[in-house]
Amino acid sequence: MNGLGGVKKVVVIGLGMTGLSVVNFWLRQTGDRDIKVIDTRATPPGQDKLPSSVELCAGQWNMNWLLEADLIVASPGIALATPELVAAKAAGIEIVGDIELFARVVTKPVVAITGSNGKSTVTSLIGEMAKEAGINVGVGGNIGFAALDMLVNEHDLYVLELSSFQLETTSSLQLKAAVYLNLSEDHMDRYNGLEDYSLAKMRIFEHAELAVYNRDDLATFPVSFSHQITSFGFDNQDYGLVTLHGEEFLALDEQPIMKTSDIALVGRHNVANSLAALALADAVNIDRQAVCRALQRYNGLAHRCQLVVNQHDVKWVNDSKATNLASTLAALKGLNLPGKLHLLVGGDGKGADFSELKLVLADLNVQLYCFGRDGNQFMPLVDAPICIETMAQAMAIAADTAQKGDMILLSPACASFDQFPNFMARGDAFIEQAKALQPRVAGAKAC
């Protein structure tokens, strides 16, 4: 099925932002269709926004609906291995995701980004580059706007962040360029191993005109790809780095573009992210001067190594977006603090192995605070960890003990779903409490 013709009965699995975008997409199409929604949650988010013409089955599956459907549209959080979906597929029912619907109707150029870490930063950065060049750009997918909602007002360019979950149900997305940033262990509760997880991400290259991979992470190399390939990395090939007169530059084929010291984003990992964004920007002919201006101005997204309070010589940093081990390792890399690091970790560990943190923490003056459902998994990593139920409790203890020169860093290495709706809510809670706790910080009490 290459378009929307012939689809009369649609069943949407999972409500929330994505599910609602799918429902609204179908309601905008011409022709009569029977649209139903199944959500196994008793009170699905977004239920109050569901049009009365759309029937909802909440709190359970409805196999009759599934088996009578012409098309099932599954939200990314619903695994294709779910028995009910396996049964529907075996009965010959096509199962797609919202990105596949987007792919079947979009008419403007699209670039896409996947990877274990850095997706949101690179996606947003390319969006800023396009805006700086005066391009009417839509930025979304796994970040910000649902992809289908961006079609309400047509754009001249679309930039999509795509998760492995979204790519599993996408088969015909035509891309001007796609980048696979990096691979690290994540979502091991959903995949049979790292190779299985990577194969899902590799689907981003299937219909791309240009594949961009990370030379410093060869797991991202598009092995079975017959179109144009380029790469980014920290050596001087393709999109890389060169040094001239003691200054390091972003470069293409050893030709300097701009100083890395002029990039507004902080951290070595963001130099790599800038190179990846540069490659995709070139693929859709975004003006190079606009690209450089965006790199000089864009200082990142909320919840990603975000300095939220710096008072009494104690820094509070919100890295709630660090929902896996690799993100936390990136945050810790290169830290050089005059005082102690108070590191808050824990939440929903998603079946990950956190032992790699042990060597990194051994080189830091660190007090570890372990909270949430899987916080106890971090306890063997350091001597004298503090294990406590909630992030708020950990923050209160850190505030009472922090001294001048210390940093209190939320970089949990875990998802938030055990105690928060999402990482943004966790980060917002951290920011709110960090501000409220200022009177308890040692520097404040000494005044």
From Swiss-Prot:
Record EC number: 6.3.2.9
GO molecular function annotations of the record: ATP binding; UDP-N-acetylmuramoylalanine-D-glutamate ligase activity
Keyword annotations from UniProtKB, A to Z: ATP-binding, Cell cycle, Cell division, Cell shape, Cell wall biogenesis/degradation, Cytoplasm, Ligase, Nucleotide-binding, Peptidoglycan synthesis
Compartment(s): Cytoplasm
GO BP annotations listed: cell division; cell wall organization; peptidoglycan biosynthetic process; regulation of cell shape
Pathway annotation: Cell wall biogenesis; peptidoglycan biosynthesis
Classification via InterPro entries: Mur-like_cat_sf (IPR036565), Mur_ligase_C (IPR004101), Mur_ligase_C_dom_sf (IPR036615), Mur_ligase_cen (IPR013221), MurD (IPR005762)
Classification via HAMAP family: MurD (MF_00639)
Family statement drawn from the similarity comment of this UniProt entry: Belongs to the MurCDEF family.
Role of this protein: Cell wall formation. Catalyzes the addition of glutamate to the nucleotide precursor UDP-N-acetylmuramoyl-L-alanine (UMA).
NCBIfam families: murD (TIGR01087)
UniProt-recorded name of the protein: UDP-N-acetylmuramoylalanine--D-glutamate ligase
Source organism: Photobacterium profundum (strain SS9)
Classification lineage: Bacteria, Pseudomonadati, Pseudomonadota, Gammaproteobacteria, Vibrionales
